[in-house]
Regions:
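Extended, subdomain-level signal for the structured scaffold at the beginning of enzyme domains
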Residues: 1-177, 190-204
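Short, thiol/selenol-centered motifs that function as redox-active sites or metal-ligating centers
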Residues: 181-188
Length: 204
């Protein structure tokens, strides 16, 4: 007998008119185990520089039909890049615009992954107790110990980050000081924060 899963969005009872992806979508586009691979860095970095993660701190994304999408940073698009960077020798710090905890799309968490989940548990406190991005920006200078800024994916990156002057200032600092800027999927929406001033990414 074929069991059909519902294609109707699932209600998020924590907020009015808010929804998670349907059971069908989750069955097709998420997995309890990630495809983590290639984590072999025989000569990892041993220096003082680290990664600044600019994470999402908002849960609900308004949609065109008036409903709210219950979102955040996508776990795979956050944790797998960080797993690789950490294995390559880089520690990381997490910051959000508000200084409040990172929001994740927990419905996409690879909860049976024997490598990713221990890594997440090991670093969960960084996501639960992030720095306030404005405080980080205020301390940035040419000698700051960040090798890169990483903006994870997930629809949560669409909320607040594209309008944030602090995000713009952090990106301006990274580009001016020849640091790496890393992002994927919806994360580059944060780069729109640069549009309100001289945009070094204009034309890309």
């Amino acid at each position: 007998m074929t069991v059909q899963t519902s294609k109707n969005p699932q209600v998020d009872i924590a907020e009015d008119n808010a929804f998670f992806p349907s059971e069908y979508s989750l069955s097709q586009y998420t997995s309890p185990v990630s495809d983590l691979d290639g984590v072999d860095y025989p000569k990892p970095y041993r220096g003082k520089h680290k990664i600044l993660v600019i994470a999402a701190d908002e849960r609900y994304l308004p949609t065109d039909n008036g409903k709210l999408f219950s979102t955040g940073n996508h776990p795979i698009e956050t944790l797998l890049p960080l797993y690789h960077l950490h294995a390559a020798g880089f520690e990381f710090e997490v910051a959000t615009i508000s200084g409040l905890m990172t929001k994740f799309e927990y419905w996409a968490m690879p909860h049976k992954d024997e490598k990713v989940m221990p890594f997440f548990e090991q670093h969960k406190s960084l996501f639960r107790n992030p720095k306030k991005l404005a405080d980080v920006v205020a301390s940035l200078n040419a000698d700051s110990e960040y090798a890169a800024i990483f903006v994870p994916g997930g629809h949560g990156a669409l909320i607040g980050l594209p309008e944030s002057q602090d995000v713009a200032a952090a990106l301006q600092w990274a580009i001016k000081n020849d640091r790496f800027v890393i992002s994927l999927c919806h994360g580059p929406a944060a780069f729109l924060a640069l549009r309100h001033s001289d945009n070094p990414l204009n034309g890309y």
